[in-house]
Amino acid sequence: MDSFRKRGRRDSESLPFESENSSLGATPLSLPPSSPPPEFSDEAAEALVEEDIEDLDGEALDVEDEEGEDLFGEGMERDYQQNLELDRYDIEELDDDNDLEELDIGARRAVDARLRRRDIELDAAAGRTKPAAFLQDEDDDLDSNLGTGFTRHRHRIYDEYSPNVGALDESGELPLESIADVKADSIAEWVTLDPVRRTIAREFKNFLLEYTDENGTSVYGNRIRTLGEVNAESLMVNYAHLGESKPILAYFLANAPAPIFRIFDRVALEATLLHYPDYERIHSDIHVRITNLPTCFTLRDLRQSHLNCLVRVSGVVTRRTGLFPQLKYIRFTCTKCGATLGPFFQDSSVEVKISFCHNCSSRGPFVINSERTVYNNYQRITLQESPGTVPSGRLPRHREVILLADLVDVAKPGEEIDVTGIYRNNFDASLNTKNGFPVFATIIEANHISQLDGSGNTDDDFSLSRLTDDEEREIRALAKSPDIHNRIIASMAPSIYGHRSIKTAIAAALFGGVPKNINGKHKIRGDINVLLLGDPGTAKSQFLKYVEKTAHRAVFATGQGASAVGLTASVRKDPITNEWTLEGGALVLADKGVCLIDEFDKMNDQDRTSIHEAMEQQSISISKAGIVTTLQARCTIIAAANPIGGRYNTTIPFNQNVELTEPILSRFDILQVVKDTVNPEIDEQLANFVVSSHIRSHPAFDPNMDVLKKVPTETGIDAKPIPQDLLRKYIHFAREKVFPRLQQMDEEKISRLYSDMRRESLATGSYPITVRHLESAIRLSEAFAKMQLSEFVRPSHIDKAIQVIIDSFVNAQKMSVKRSLSRTFAKYLI
């Protein structure tokens, strides 16, 4: 060690910057301030380091032995003996020269650049910054042997910390194909980068201005012009068009809708200003509404994977809140200096808070400037699964839907709608308290809402029919069958034997008549109401259950468990906002469908009176808690009731057999009395049919069993039934596509029938015949015309309607006058 020190001193005495007149060897500090800095060599630098070490050691170095440590002593052999604990080496960590290859210049540049970025990030994280003089210049390494070629993009500082987006053009945008390669952790982060955002805006603007239909007409150019003509603020964009023209944008829209919609809305406003330069004076924003999203979910299909994605759901509106102002762009006023701060965009998930005034540098307090703050319309509705889509035995699911801007008040309770929106999560403290661990509530932020017709199709121009061309041809071919009426009647509840009159009434109710609106002022309903009254065990409830499964939209209720507000509508106080909200009942939820009420006679008189308006005017008027409104209840009502005492007494009139008032009875188009009479022949056939049904319904059923050959399978109606799936499609097609008109109607025959029925009703003391029954005859005629998909009501359809009305009227009479009435009305049945 001492020899090493001496060698270091000797080297230091011969440094090149020593002057000839120096005594002990001058250091650089002894040079004049104006002298140029001397050149340092590696040996000189090493010598200076050794001198510094010597000075720091001080007296500790003098303690060492002058001879140094003897490495060749007597214990030298022990150092080279085997030691199992220490002689263990990890092969992977050994620096083996054989496994290394010399890097080329490009690889060395990449390694150096990576190390340099690491140093910059570590310095930035530790708060250390280098002076500008020590920053490496971009030309330093070009002259060196390594030639790293490190280039700084001073005009784009964020590139050091953002993903490598690729090659940019002169305008800072990317080719459309390059943005498909997502170079970020998520699509939401990728589309927020400036180059990607500008590229998306450019491509969507080209889509709006250049997309044409098969005739070469600009689709969205015409829609933008129409938007300006009606002063609207929503631009409808078909998702199929976007997927066909710009599939990358459609993919980004489905998976990151929130940032994409902000880009689309800004581009839509720019495209609108091309046609209407001053349109911002009318609307400051244009909202892009996405229609025809290909996949439609039910509310129970939504999962965690759908969060923050664009979804499409359908359901029935059960509740709607009032209209609230929502902060959109907020401005604050500093109370100390009076400066106005903002505007700040108010997101729906994060509250805007400021803590510093740029004018007076104070930390508040700040108040909201209400005059210059921009608000947005806000409303919440509750969407519930449609009654026909809920699995049996399950409760219907519901979700809160947020309506913003011009979407408010587009749907009322009871209407079936199709919602396209963003499926979001929302913090709810009550759920955390209830479950004991963090749980988020989920909402749907609506982007587009369209009304659904009875068949589940939207009412906009972009809806697609559920029926294929082959199915429509099959339906029209079925309508040409000569016995189509009998086949439809035989297909009604095939598991129930007989009861042709009830099946005819139910078939007519499912097809319905044609609603009319006289000069837009007076509406005449087209739905047919049916009342089934009879003895226990006559399959009344089974008929209702069959209709519930067959009808496209059906709501089942019982008279004992249904109150007035449960059938019509109720007003409920929201526990959060303390606001009175409106909730629709069974009749409102069954709008454009069928409402089935079992045990109709068990209802209270007050509850039964509440449905008077719904049965005739097909609307429900509400005047409660300051809410005065009208809800739609355009539905068919099929009710079942038991007579007084349990069994129907044929010796007394109809109105004495049931506890129903005349206003209710007159609103039913068809009154069907079902009596359990003793008939040995019919009873034997019924018993055989029931046994056959049980045998065929067994899981181990064998169609080749000999016992079945002796058992009849007919339902008591001589016609071939239609498969149930085809029958449902047939009914939906007839209700939505066929609207028969009255032509060549025998007005004299109808008037004479009405006159005779009123006279006999007064004489027999039965239920009264009113003008409503005359309208019932017309509705039944239209229903039979719909069964044939006929465009006009023919005389044969009127004859069938008259037969149903006469049978309903005669069967409701006393036994003593039934035969005479049958002979009186026989002339109308020829």
UniProtKB/Swiss-Prot annotation:
It catalyses: ATP + H2O = ADP + phosphate + H(+). A zinc finger (C4-type) spans 334-360. It comes from the Eukaryota. GO terms for biological process: DNA replication; DNA replication-dependent chromatin assembly; double-strand break repair via break-induced replication; mitotic DNA replication initiation; premeiotic DNA replication. SUPFAM superfamilies: Nucleic acid-binding proteins (SSF50249), P-loop containing nucleoside triphosphate hydrolases (SSF52540). PROSITE patterns: MCM_1 (PS00847), MCM_2 (PS50051). It holds the Pfam family MCM_lid. CDD domains: MCM2. It is found in: Nucleus. Residues 30-39 have a biased composition (Pro residues). A motif (Arginine finger) lies at residues 666-669. The keyword DNA-binding applies. InterPro entries: MCM (IPR031327), MCM2 (IPR008045), MCM_CS (IPR018525), MCM_dom (IPR001208), MCM_lid (IPR041562), MCM_N (IPR027925), MCM_OB (IPR033762), NA-bd_OB-fold (IPR012340). One of its GO terms (cellular component) is nuclear replication fork. GO terms for molecular function: ATP binding; ATP hydrolysis activity; DNA replication origin binding; H3-H4 histone complex chaperone activity; helicase activity; nucleosome binding; single-stranded DNA binding; zinc ion binding. Its EC number is 3.6.4.12. Residues 484-691 form the MCM domain. Residues 1-45 are annotated as: Disordered. The keyword Kinase does not apply. ATP binds at G534, D535, P536, G537, T538, A539, K540, S541. It is an enzyme of class 3 (hydrolase). Disulfide bonds: none annotated. Belongs to the MCM family. Acts as a component of the mcm2-7 complex (mcm complex) which is the putative replicative helicase essential for 'once per cell cycle' DNA replication initiation and elongation in eukaryotic cells. The active ATPase sites in the mcm2-7 ring are formed through the interaction surfaces of two neighboring subunits such that a critical structure of a conserved arginine finger motif is provided in trans relative to the ATP-binding site of the Walker A box of the adjacent subunit. The six ATPase active sites, however, are likely to contribute differentially to the complex helicase activity. Component of the mcm2-7 complex. The complex forms a toroidal hexameric ring with the proposed subunit order mcm2-mcm6-mcm4-mcm7-mcm3-mcm5. The heterodimers of mcm4/mcm6 and mcm3/mcm5 interact with mcm2 and mcm7. Interacts with mcm10. This is DNA replication licensing factor mcm2. It comes from Schizosaccharomyces pombe (strain 972 / ATCC 24843) (Fission yeast). The gene is mcm2.
